[in-house]
């Protein structure tokens, strides 16, 4: 096999039991410069067992492209729906040999079972590698080496973590239970300055225990997310960060800190349930086209936005407020940058709201920068004998740009109307009309005279 495609098709059973550190059940060793690709198709069973000591060159299926004559060629493994690959605790299930000296791309398609008792089931080296799964299962972690790698799972089961190394990597996981995936790691960091941009998309699933690490951009599509450690880091540059789309829910619990930007589409929700002590932070900017809410029946939760806040028409911000005097407890939105756009404020009176006269008002939105957004109340806000309305700017500082609920109107001091300046003939014209009317009445005389 020195030219063209090296091809192996297994529909039977291949079982190798050996202690050797450099043992493979099925191996393709491509050394020729005339080789164009190497492909293994498995619809049967391939098993490597008997290993005791782990070695990076021990694998049930292995590609080797080493030597001075080696070239970068596609290395393809297809595991069909009936295919089974099993490896012991000293072995990988599928790997590109550590002796590889080039950037051959490993392309793995799995609809069957790939499993290893070792921590890693799949390991590749430098190259633009691909793993695709539409059914079946992957039992063991995956490491795709440096390069622009792609990991795509649209079905089946994954038990193990996914690690992608340096490069601009893409991972898409949909309709897969993430509870058995401890970590999804995009590689180097969350900065775009190095040219490596990693994107993770999670669709039709939920995140509760999975750590999401080193992704410049994370897109949640019809997905519920709750951080297992109350933090998440994403890209901080414009166009990167955490994106909630298609009815996704970010359940922020009682405390959550996002390093990066947050974008909420019209059907998605950022939700905090802090019971009055919730603390939530977004280090970057927030674009809200959907709903941000800390309504949980208790006032006092705080969302702090380190960058700008942009409200898209139709967006809402929901809070709990004790409706009383100026010192009343309320949920609060703090924006350290600028605000723009429009959002609707929905205020739910906290239990026991007495209603009282305010002076300055109850501050519900605190803007440090330019306050260019327009917030409007969704409906009447009432407690006791009082009704509260929403005002921009304070009383003592009428240009502070903050937003207040007030139960008193600030009177407008009337101004005297301007005095008009008439031309000289105007007074004669007006007095002449009066004189003519009087003369006419005098000419009528009395009834007796007539």
Features from the language model and the residues they span:
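A broad structural signal for short, well-ordered beta-strand segments within beta-sheet-rich domains
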Residues: 35-37, 72-74, 102-103, 215, ...
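Extracellular beta-solenoid/beta-roll
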Residues: 138-139, 148-152, 157-337, 341-342, ...
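Extracellular beta-strand/beta-solenoid scaffold signature
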Residues: 1, 17-33, 50-74, 87-100, ...
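Right-handed parallel beta-helix
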Residues: 5-17, 37-50, 74-86, 105-115, ...
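Outer membrane beta-barrel translocator domains of Type V secretion systems
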Residues: 15, 412-450
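Alpha-helix capping and inter-helical loop/turn segments
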Residues: 100-102, 310-311
């Amino acid at each position: 096999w020195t030219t063209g495609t090296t091809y192996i098709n297994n529909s039977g059973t291949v079982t190798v039991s050996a202690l050797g550190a450099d043992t493979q059940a099925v191996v393709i060793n491509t050394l020729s410069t005339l080789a164009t690709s190497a492909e293994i198709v498995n619809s049967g069973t391939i098993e490597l067992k008997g290993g005791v000591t782990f070695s990076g060159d021990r694998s049930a299926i292995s590609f080797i492209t080493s030597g001075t004559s080696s070239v970068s060629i596609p290395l393809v493994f297809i595991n069909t729906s009936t295919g089974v690959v099993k490896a012991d605790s000293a072995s990988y299930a599928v790997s590109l040999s550590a002796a590889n000296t080039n950037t051959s791309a490993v392309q793995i398609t799995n609809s069957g079972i790939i499993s290893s008792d070792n921590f890693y089931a799949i390991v590749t080296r430098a190259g633009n590698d691909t793993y695709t799964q539409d059914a079946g299962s992957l039992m063991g972690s995956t490491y795709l080496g440096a390069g622009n790698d792609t990991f795509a799972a649209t079905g089946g089961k994954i038990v193990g973590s996914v690690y992608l190394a340096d490069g601009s990597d893409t991972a898409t996981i949909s309709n897969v239970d993430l509870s058995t995936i401890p970590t999804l790691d995009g590689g180097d960091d969350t900065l775009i300055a190095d040219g490596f941009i990693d994107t993770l998309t999670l669709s039709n699933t939920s995140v509760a225990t999975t750590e999401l690490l080193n992704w410049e951009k994370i897109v949640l599509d019809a997905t519920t997310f709750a951080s297992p450690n109350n933090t998440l880091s994403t890209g901080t540059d414009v166009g990167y960060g955490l994106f909630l789309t298609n009815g996704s829910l970010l359940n922020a619990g009682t405390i959550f800190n996002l390093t990066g930007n947050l974008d909420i589409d019209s059907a998605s929700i950022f939700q905090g349930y802090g019971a009055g002590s919730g603390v939530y932070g977004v280090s970057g900017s927030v674009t809200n086209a959907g709903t941000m809410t800390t309504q949980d029946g208790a006032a006092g939760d705080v969302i702090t936005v380190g960058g700008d806040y942009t409200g898209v028409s139709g967006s809402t911000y929901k809070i709990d407020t004790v409706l009383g005097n100026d010192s009343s407890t309320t949920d609060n939105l703090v924006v350290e940058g600028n605000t723009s756009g429009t959002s609707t404020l929905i205020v739910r009176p906290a239990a026991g709201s007495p209603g009282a006269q305010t002076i300055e008002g109850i501050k519900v939105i605190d803007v440090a920068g330019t306050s260019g957004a327009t917030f409007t109340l969704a409906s009447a806000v009432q407690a006791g004998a009082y009704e509260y309305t929403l005002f921009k700017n304070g009383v003592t500082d009428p240009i502070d740009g903050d937003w207040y609920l007030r139960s008193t109107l600030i009177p407008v001091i009337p101004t005297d109307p301007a005095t008009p300046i008439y031309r000289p003939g105007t007074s004669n014209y007006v007095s002449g009309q009066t004189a003519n009317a009087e003369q006419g009445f005098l000419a009528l005389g009395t009834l007796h005279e007539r």
